[in-house]
Amino acid sequence: MGERDQSSDTDQERKGGKHPYSSHYSSDFGSSPQSSGPSSPVNTPPCASNREKNPKRHLSDHHVRHQTVRKVSPKAIPNKKGVRVGFRSQSLNREPLRKDPDIVTKRVLSARLLKITELQNEVSELQVKLAQLLKENKALKSLQYRQEKALSKFEDAENEISQLIHRHNGEITALKERLRKSQEKERMAEKRVKDTEGELFRTKFSLQKLKKISEARHLPERDDLAKKLVSAELKLDNTERKIKELSKNLELSTNSFQRQLLAERKRAFEAHDENKILQKELQRLHHKLKEKEKELDIKNIYANRLPKSSPKKEKEIARKHASCQSDFTDLCTKAVQTAEDFEPEEFPFTAQTVLCYENRWDGSEYLPSYLEYQERNEHGSESLSSTLEQEGKYSDDQDSCTAKQETGKSECEWEREELDKVKGKSSLLGRTEKLVLEAGSVQTESYQAQTIDKFQDEAERLKTEMLLAKLNEINKELQDPQSLSRPLLPLLPNFESKLYSPDRSLRPYTFSESLDRSFNGQHLSDMSFLTPRDEGQSPGLIRSPAPSDEFSFGSYVPSFGKTPGKSNPPSQKNSLLDFQSNMSEGLSKDSLDFISRKEKKATLMEQLFGTSASASATNTSASTTTNTTTNTNTNTNTNTNTNCNVPSKSIDSHFPAASRGDLDPLHFLSGDRSSRVREPDGEDEDLFLSEGRSFNPNRHRLKHTSTKPTVTAVDSIDEDIEEVTLR
């Protein structure tokens, strides 16, 4: 291959018109003119001579040349001998070319050519080696690539093997764990098998033993069990027989209970109907009572007072309320006094019936509280009426609802509801009873409220009468100084001397008992009656003009208040009559002197108050003279009547001032309806209108005629009060 490449190179050089050695020749023989033309054999000798002349330069050029010189064929060598050198060598040497080189130069040139050929051969060999090395390098590179590829595959295979080994190890551990568990289960199963085999062996042994025992007929335990079985069967028969008997008794008792329940149901219906009738009757009587009250307010304003009984009487009344249902209606309606049975008469005040005493509290202190209490009672009465109406509606609605529901319910439920209904009715009756009792108390308080205004008028009239009596006494003392040694006028008796006298306890007075009961333990020593404490006062001080709103009598200033509740009229009547009987002798002696001085008193009254006051003073003096003449004859009768028939009453506990021991002057100022004495003018009869009332049915009212004395004590007016029963 190297030879082919060299020949191809030479051919190319030939085609280009250049010789591979032309450079050498041109450098050596540059002055020849035929250097540019084709080589000829004629020109070769001078070229050879030039080469021989400059061998060193040729060698230096030869060393400078590159190794790219190719191998020249031997045929081309003689053709190039005659070629002239180029213009370069000619210009450098400036020597003429020799046409015939010598032999030495030829030899040198031939050696040079040989050397060149040798070197070219070496180059070609080296080129061949280089090509072989390149091919070998390519083969090695391809081999290396294939080896690297195979190596990478091998490495991948190694990695897969490690993963496979890891997975295999995990599977091995899992299988080992399963093996361990299965071995444990197997051991446990073997243990259970052993236990079951042992138990089976024991059961077989016990079964054989029991079979042997069962085959044995005559055993003591078998006999005992047989006896127990027989006794149990007998007991079972007895219990069954008893159960049958008890079931029969139960049926009979249920039948009787059904009959009894039906009877009780009928009674309950009857009681319900009767209750409705009684409620209607109660409402009718309530309306009737209201009408009677209105009539009493119109006809007789003094007959509407309802006193409160003593604590003992209240306890008895409470027992009656608990024992019988009809008693509470009687007690509630007993306070109503009709105008047909009893028409009390009004009696004017007289000076003999005036009883005054001091009180630690004035009426103005507790009057507002009493009025507030009356207003609360009025609101209570209104709420009471509304609750009664609501309860009536509720009972009617309940009856209608139960009547509708009876058809859809079973018999047992219906009976149970009937019993509950009877209980509800009884509770409703209890509530109505309480409400009626409260209504009675409200009525009493309303009666008291109606009399407050009347008491004020009576108190004013009492003031005027007491002023007249005091003025009469002052006038008598001024005109007749010798009368100071005489006993006081009966208009203003010396109550203080009577209260502290030693023979007071011997007289049949009922003041102490009644006052102790009425005023919560207050004794009479706490009170001081209207009497001049200092008789030695100067007339100027006594005759000092009194203010218009109150009257002053010596050191006493009377306080007039409204009556809080029921007073104690029988005890007051007794005390008044005792006082009249004791003072009758003094009245008979002083009556003539009093008549002679009444004209002077009238003139004094005209100077102070006008003609109306003088007229009232003359009327009072006239009534006093007539009463004194009659009281002398009736002393014994009044004492016996009052001492025998005076019940003890208590002050109304509803009034707030009574709980603290307040003493109302009008409790003893009995001219407010309780102890008035009227003169015998032939038109009306003398009668004490008692503000209280006794609930004792054993007491009887004293009948009086015109032949009896003027002053008559009336014990009770229970027969004159309409008693309504709901039986």
Curated annotation (Swiss-Prot):
Polar residues composition bias: which ranges?
565-577
Q: Per UniProt, which keywords does this protein have?
A: Cell projection, Cilium, Coiled coil, Cytoplasm, Cytoskeleton, Phosphoprotein, Protein transport, Transport
Compositional bias annotation for Basic and acidic residues: 1-15
Record flagged with keyword Nucleotide-binding: no
Where does this protein reside within or beyond the cell? Cytoplasm, Cytoskeleton; Cytoplasm, Cytoskeleton, Cilium axoneme; Cytoplasm, Cytoskeleton, Cilium basal body
From what superkingdom does this record's organism come? Eukaryota
Gene Ontology cellular-component terms for this entry are:
axoneme; ciliary basal body; cilium; mitochondrion; neuron projection; nucleolus; nucleoplasm; photoreceptor connecting cilium
Its Gene Ontology molecular function terms?
protein-containing complex binding
Biased composition (Basic residues) is annotated at 54-73
Query: What does the annotation say about its assembly with partners?
Result: Interacts with NINL. Interacts with OFD1. Interacts with FAM161A. Interacts with FAM161A. Interacts with components of the IFT complex B.
State what this protein does: Involved in intraflagellar protein (IFT) transport in photoreceptor cilia.
Protein name as annotated: Lebercilin
